C-alpha cells in the first residue's frame, strides 16, 4: 500500500498492476461498448438528432488536460454557462453537489438523465482508459473552469490517475459536499492499492442504484415545486461537448 503525502509535482506513480487491469478490463468490455454504441446511435435519431458522442476537455493526472469522451445526453449546442454558474455555487457554498439534471434541466435530452445517473453516458471513457489518460478507478476529471476555482490543497486530488469510478462516487457522491469530495479523493491517492480498487469496483453497482433513486426523487420533487431550467442555445460546434460529472 502506498502511504505518503502526494502533490501535483510529486504525484502517485501509476502501478503496473493498475495499468494491466485497466487494459484487460477494457478489452473485455469493448464488445459491450460497441453494442451499446449501436443502440445509442439508433435511439439518438429519435430522441435528439445529432452526434452520438461528444468530446470535452478535462483536467486529470497532474493537472494535465485531455479530451474526454461521453455519450451525448444534452441538446446540441446547449449553453455551458448555466453549468459553470452551478459549479461555482457548489464550490463556494460547499453545499451537497446536486447535479443539474436532478433539477429537471431541460437541456438534457429525453432519457438522458437516466444515462447520466446510471453512469452509462461515461462508457466511451473506456477509450480514455486505453489511451492512458484515465483508469477504471480514480478521482473524476473536472472541466478546466472548475479546476481554476480550486485552491492549491484541493488540487491534490489530481495527483492520482482519474477514473470512471472512485472512492467519492461510492461514498455518497451527490450527497457529499465539494470539500468531502476532495478529502475522499486525496485519501484514495494516499492509500492506493489493488485491494482498495477492488472494493470500490464492487461498491460501484449499489452506489449507482442509489444515485438513480436519488435523482429520480429529486426530479419528482423539482417538478412539483420548481420550474425547469430553460435551455439556452449558443452558436458552437456540436462536438465541443458539454460540462458533465
What are these regions (language model features)?
Residues 53-106, 165-183:
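Short, glycine-rich, amphipathic interfacial segments at transmembrane boundaries or analogous
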Residues 31, 51, 66, 106, ...:
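A residue-level structural signature of the nucleotidyltransferase/glycosyltransferase Rossmann-like core
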Residues 13-17, 32, 100-107, 116, ...:
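Aromatic-acidic/polar surface patches that form glycan- and anion
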Residues 19, 58-60, 64-74, 107, ...:
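Short, cationic motifs built from Arg/Lys/His that form the positively charged side of catalytic pockets
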Residues 5-81, 152, 194, 199-245:
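A hydrophobic, helix-centered structural microdomain
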Residues 1-4, 102, 116-117, 123-245:
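Hydrophobic structural segments characteristic of membrane proteins
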